[in-house]
A protein has these predicted regions:
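The feature captures the beta-strand-to-loop junction immediately N-terminal to the Walker
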Residues: 33-35
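Helix-to-loop junction immediately C-terminal to a conserved catalytic motif
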Residues: 48
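Conserved ABC transporter NBD signature motif
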Residues: 56-64
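Conserved ABC ATPase "signature" region
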Residues: 97, 112-130, 155
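Conserved ABC ATPase signature
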Residues: 134-138, 142
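Catalytic Walker B motif of ABC-type/P-loop ATPase nucleotide-binding domains
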Residues: 159-163
Length: 264
């Protein structure tokens, strides 16, 4: 379980995250939403340890992350970054092996356990047939799955994703999010991801945190958070929210505009 309590982050004299408290349990997906500059990526970076925290606590299964070394932290949470930070000359297998760095000796020697973890991660990310391909030969969606596999190879209880569907077409977006949801359930991962597409959030998230100007405005289920009033106010854009007849997920569209493209 990932628990964030009274978290504050500042850039210089400016406080950019203000008293954030939320949690995500094993097997759940928490989506961070909000307009540009709301603090979604900052929150992911604060939890991952790449952005310093001004005050507050971040705990994984009761362990305070600020008390852990870098190597210890890498064994409790893994990050799928926003940008595709992969060297094109590496093979897929080599890139995924980087996720085992915290488990290797100081000489960087891999062992059978590392190799087994990498093979399992490749299988879970549906990349077994790509193991010996160079990163540069892969599509954007495939590279995003390599980053996911690298994170899975860390064998952590918490998974963080920063805008994982950016620059992906609809097919790759839904494939990736379906895979993340499947893995969250099967491996009992606590997943937190920053997202822009609110309709995708509605279908794939168990919990939603709405951030505006570094403040947590709403926290709950998609049905509780993704309401026309909350979203219109946060994004400064009037929207309508209807309920999907089969799944019950909220669906958002611009207010006053219907399927024929004409104003109401």
């Amino acid at each position: 379980m990932l628990t964030i309590t009274s978290l504050q982050v500042a850039y210089g004299a400016k406080v950019v995250l203000k008293d954030i408290s939320l949690d995500v349990s094993a097997g759940e997906i928490l989506a961070l939403i909000g307009p540009n500059g709301a603090g979604k990526t900052t929150l992911v970076r604060a939890v991952s340890g790449t952005t310093p925290v001004l005050s507050g606590q971040i705990c994984v299964d009761g362990r305070e992350l600020s008390e852990l070394s870098t190597a210890q932290r890498a064994k409790v949470l893994a990050v799928v970054p926003q940008a595709r930070q992969l060297g094109g000359a590496y093979s897929v297998e080599q890139a995924v092996m980087m996720g085992r760095t915290a488990y290797m000796s100081w000489l960087g020697h891999e062992n059978e356990r590392d190799r087994a973890a990498v093979q399992l991660a490749l299988k879970q990310a549906r990349l077994e047939d790509f193991a010996h391909r160079q990163i540069a030969q892969l599509s954007g969606g495939e590279q995003q799955r390599v980053l996911l596999a690298r994170a899975l190879a860390q064998s952590t209880p918490v998974l963080l994703l920063d805008e994982p569907t950016n620059h992906l077409d609809l097919q790759h977006q839904t494939n990736l999010l379906s895979l993340v949801r499947k893995l969250a359930r099967e491996k009992q991962l606590a997943v937190m991801m920053a997202m822009h597409d609110l309709n995708l959030v509605s279908f794939f998230a168990d919990k939603v945190a709405l951030l505006v100007d570094g403040e947590l405005k709403q926290f709950g289920t998609p049905q509780e958070v993704i309401q026309s009033g909350h979203i219109s106010e946060a994004y400064q854009t009037p929207v309508e929210v209807v309920t999907h007849p089969e799944t019950g997920a909220p669906i958002i569209f611009p207010k006053g505009v219907w399927g024929n493209g004409e104003e109401k």
